[in-house]
Amino acid sequence: MNYLLVDTCVLSDMMRQYNPCLPNAGFVEGVFLKKNMLRMINSVVQDMDGTSGYIVVSAFAFLELINKFSDIFKEEISKKIMSLNRIIATIQQPPSWMIIEETNLETAKEFCQVPNAIGTGEHISADDAVHIATALQRGDDITLLTTDHVLKQLNLQRISVVTD
């Protein structure tokens, strides 16, 4: 089973394109959705029998989208093609290929295991650390799809990182 955890930026591109009336429609490249990520995501989303895997999203990523909604989706809001209700509806009834992981005490415990910096000394932000902690709390091998190239240097068991 393939588990793909998306960060907030990748999730924002997915939400720009997601149509609940066509939940298995593939995504296209966007600002943050890059070629390799896209191939991996579409292999899950377009799998009609649901056996290839899941897109995992931390509840925290949705909180970030809601908190920064008017900045992240400024263009879509002006064109009236995105609303906060759409984000909330996705949280309340996610597509069959999406798992929304709670941010809870287990996340906090795993957060303590995330290093503050990578080997080069570059800092790992608290936001990124929450996404990493979410990946760790699952206990499965998981691929983190992120826009943060610093995380490509991360060396943690069970987590691989894709930035393109």
Predicted regions and their residues:
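Short, well-structured N-terminal submotif of metal-dependent ribonuclease cores
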Residues: 1-60, 72-82
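General structural signal for alpha-helix termini and helix-helix connectors
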Residues: 50, 71-75, 93-97, 117-120
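Active-site neighborhoods of divalent-metal-dependent phosphate/nucleic-acid chemistry enzymes
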Residues: 96-143
